[in-house]
Amino acid sequence: MKWTARVTEAQWQTWQKEGWSMLPYIAEYPLPGGGLPPSWRRAWEDSAPYAFLLESAKGGRYTYLALNPVAILEGKGEQAVWTDLQSGEHGAIHGQPLTVMNDWIAPYRAPRVPGMPFFSGGFAGYLGYDVARSLERLPTQAADDTDIPDYVWMRVNELWIYDHETSCLYCAVHMPNPVRLSEFSSQTDLANEVMLNETASILGKHYAEAVQRTERMLTQWKNIIHAGETDPAYPLRCARLSEKGLEAVHQESEGWKTAFSQQDFEHAVKRVQEYIAQGDVFQVNLSIRQQRTLAALPENIYEWLRLLNPSPYMGMLRMPDLRIVSGSPELLVKLEDGRVSARPIAGTRRRGLTPDEDAAMAAELLSSEKERAEHIMLVDLERNDIGRIAEYGSVHVPELLTVEYYSHVMHLVSQVEGKLATGRTAIDVIAATFPGGTITGAPKVRTMEIIEELEPVRRGPYTGSLGWIDYNGNMELNIIIRTLAVQGNTAYLQTGAGIVIDSDPYREYRECRNKARAVMKAVQCGEEEAALSRSGITGG
């Protein structure tokens, strides 16, 4: 297969002298017939215990896959552990999550390859909602009833990137710089010349190794595609959807349990409205966590979710005892070449059963004074958050109150943008914007205090963020909603609704239920598929 090297050895020589700690190599392979597998079954079979997939299944440009990260950082509270997955070395770190992350990320820097995707290597993982406890002083009232980490990040030096617009596959490899410029400073001229010659030889060997690794990656990608195309479960899934349709999946809530009953939730809604009447807050996002025991593999549930509800910020993080299966539609924040952007979602209606009903629901959503007021309030909150780390006067709203459609619901969305101030970093952007205002409320700190008071259990990954930070300081993080967290054989699903002064408690409860439907249906389909597989009826 014809390929194009997007980085030359001469570029490596320049970057090596500039002192970058990591050197990127990217090979481009055109795949005009389509380059994504129908299912990711082979990818998970090939992966180490840690792996991640980030997909833009609706409207996005790139799909990212990494199967062999080189290191892991995970923490809960102020205790963290790092592990070098190549050497097996590990160690404990004590500190606030974003400080620990910053110290772990800081030594690794690489130049961006012009014209290539921003993310070609770096860090991928998630921040759970409870990382906010290190950013704001919050009470401790909700039960911490799981040992799911507050955050997990993987460092990746090999990454597959599929470009949906150009139908090209990029195989990206990052290699450590063998000798940094700073190591030359204390040497004599003759010693420096000898070292430069030796370094050029080492650099050439590293470059050749990077080329070989991308060639192996291409072969592995071909195997992943072939396995996906011959996966016996995939046509059965498609047949079920085409024969019965999405609405034929019934009783999706069967087997789910919650510590937050409908009665308790509606009482909590009324308590929020009392706080609003007192002037404490304008809006609070109140959520319900449900859980159940799983027989299905989380990987197969993800396959169902991408069929049932393709979303722009889908993804899966795979760890030894934890899977994050995300069908998120919402961006928390993006940082690309110094431009910061957020895309808040607030305002929801169910999808109509007919085109006319769908249009009527959209018109109702757009004309709702309640939904518009709530949305604009949260857009203002995002403007203020981004304004904390943006150049003065650069924050603007290029898109306001647009309807976006998903399989089971429609939402109001807007776009907020600004220019990152000099000296600010991706970690500063996270500190300013996390957690998102659309899933807490306004004002943010007081709403988080009320959430802690009224929700019976801690949120864990829910309403945190999943995504990536690259070696050049760019970043893209979603908001973890429409997401399943699976620890062992227990699945956790949480959904929320924005409560305002004129909210109807029952309607807000139903909104939470509607938002859970797509993931619950994916779970139900996965469970039924697992039962058939155990009986020998399907290859899934």
Regions found by a protein language model. Name each.
Residues 1-540:
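Extended alpha-helical targeting/anchoring segments
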